[in-house]
Amino acid sequence: MKWRELSAQDPPRRFRGETYWARPLPAFGDTRASILVVGLAPAAHGGNRTGRIFTGDESGNFLFRAMYEAGLANQPDSLRRGDGLKLSGALVSAAARCAPPGNRPLPQELDNCREYLARELSLLPPAAVLVALGALAFDACLKVLAQTGCEMPRPRPRFAHGAVLRIGSHALLASYHPSQQNTYTGKLTPPMLRKVLLRAAREARKTGDPSSLRSSG
């Protein structure tokens, strides 16, 4: 039995009685977006429970509040599917599609899920902007861009919060992941994440793609 299913069988007391999604999670947001936000993996009692990426946990609240303040979401909260949240010009995805033990997917899991991330990127404009949340998501984005034929910088870029790379027709921006480990310690603050997202929106506008003005949930 997979971890996503085991987590659903023995949830914390506050979630007992809920029906868990407990399946791979798709991306969420504006399918005509010019910004692709890439996290690591669904949380066992967040997205794995609610059926929507970055939904139902503190990491999601932190992310979507920043997206709301950057003009990419219509509300600051992400509680459950059907809560009215809509994204404008942004699609939120993840490097791994199933909740992993300890929030740490194995390399093989990341390799297996890369095709889904590549497919999502292929549906977006040729100059779509990528925002990687954390080092593993950053690495996944680099591998996907290489897979699509983009020439990789040499030496290979290393993750750093606030980094902005030009790879092929894309801009790749990096941010610390909005995990509680980072947000509770102040390693990542709301202004820090908001600054990265605002920069992503500016980069998207440079492409001349009007998708950042459209809203879709």
Place the predicted regions along the sequence by residue.
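N-terminal basic, low-structured, amphipathic or hydrophobic segments
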Residues: P210-S212
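A cross-taxon signal for low-complexity, glycine/charged-rich
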Residues: S216-G217
